[in-house]
Amino acid sequence: MDFALNLTQEQRLAMTQEMQLSIKLLQMSSFELQEYVEKELQENPVLDIKESNVDKVEKDKLEYKEIIKNLDFDNYSHHSYDRNPDEEVSPFNFISEEKSLKEYLKDQIRDLDENQCIKTICLYIIENIDDRGYLILENEEIEEELKISKELAAYCVDLIHSLEPHGIGARNLAECLKIQIKQKDMDEENIFIMIDKYLEFIAENKYNVIAKELNIDVKQAQEYGDLIKTLSPKPSRGFYTGESVRYISPDAYIKKIDSEYFIIMNDDLTPRLTINAIYKDIINNDTDKDAVSYVKEKLNSALFLIKSIQHRKSTIYRVLEKIVEIQKDYFDYGESYLKPMTLKEIASSMDMHESTVSRAIRDKYIHINRGIVKIKDLFTTGMAASFSEENVSSLIIKNSIKKMIDNEDRKKPLSDQKICDLINEEGMNISRRTVAKYREEMGIKSSKGRKRF
């Protein structure tokens, strides 16, 4: 009886652990899952990666390259290299694709017609530029650390400021913007005053206040503001700074073949896991009880993981299958055909819990004929429409708001209330607060912020 009770408890515990892992993996993004699997591969010796044919070919290539490296090319040159002897090797072949900001700056310093002492000081300053392109040292610190004069430190910092990208080596946003203005050969004092004192007013479109303070025309103040807005607040933008860029990879591809849609799961996102055969032999043949117990524990953990990854894939697939069924018009014709669709609706139709659907779409993406789409964006709340039995998608309303704003008179932009009235005239029932909410979600300023003088 005790044995049966213990067995039942162990089975329940195992089931609980498996369910917890399943839930945990389901809500992970593909990137988070990759990191988790890599960690498990390091910690669990029973886990192994199933080698694909592509991996084997790449492995063979690497082994072949190693063999070639050890060959005596003096003896084999007439057989192994058939490049035209007159063909020039481009120096660009040896340039790294990811040239860092600091490397780019150092190259410019080396090309300057300055003595080696000044170049060395400039190289030191470059090493103290952060990932944004800002200098983290004051002139006094440079003087003190390098034991140089005030004039020499200032001269070298000015040299850094003359480099590209413009604005490099500034200590703060205002200095960064002013360096860029100087590079444009502009010396209008009011622009510098606006940068020093009125950046917040520029952001809030309060050009009437700025114009009054500077005793200039409102239109002129706005033109200066427009110029300032074209400047980069982050000089390092576009350069490799040592941080890896994470690109979005879709969890699945939605492909239309003839008149039917197919869901192709992206299996490249996670390694194909298997059980290392060596550890299977230990369980079957080893007499060391501790070793067998350890391997069994790790084996159960590995099997839980493999099963949970398969369950994650299956759940996402099933949810996508239902989405494609409901949103066929969206996939065929575009955003304006997106139907209102809720988590509850999907869950109910699949006999699945709403929280499971929520986890299945969290931070997941699909690739469709118009690009990569976040699955969550396909779930919209509905607004009542007097002209249709179906609700109108919030995305359709957002498109209407954006279209109205794009076509408005810039000198007399539409208020949220006016947009609300116009949308209601089209037969869609919506409040002013909802208009404001959707406008802000699209990153569009209020009528006050959009006004042109």
Curated annotation (Swiss-Prot):
Domain of life: Bacteria
CC annotations in GO: DNA-directed RNA polymerase complex
PROSITE patterns in UniProt: SIGMA54_1, SIGMA54_2, SIGMA54_3
Keywords noted in UniProt: DNA-binding, DNA-directed RNA polymerase, Nucleotidyltransferase, Sigma factor, Transcription, Transcription regulation, Transferase
RPON box, short sequence motif: residues: 431-439
Leader sequence segment: none
Role this protein plays: Sigma factors are initiation factors that promote the attachment of RNA polymerase to specific initiation sites and are then released.
Family stated for the protein in its record: Belongs to the sigma-54 factor family.
Record-given protein name: Putative RNA polymerase sigma-54 factor
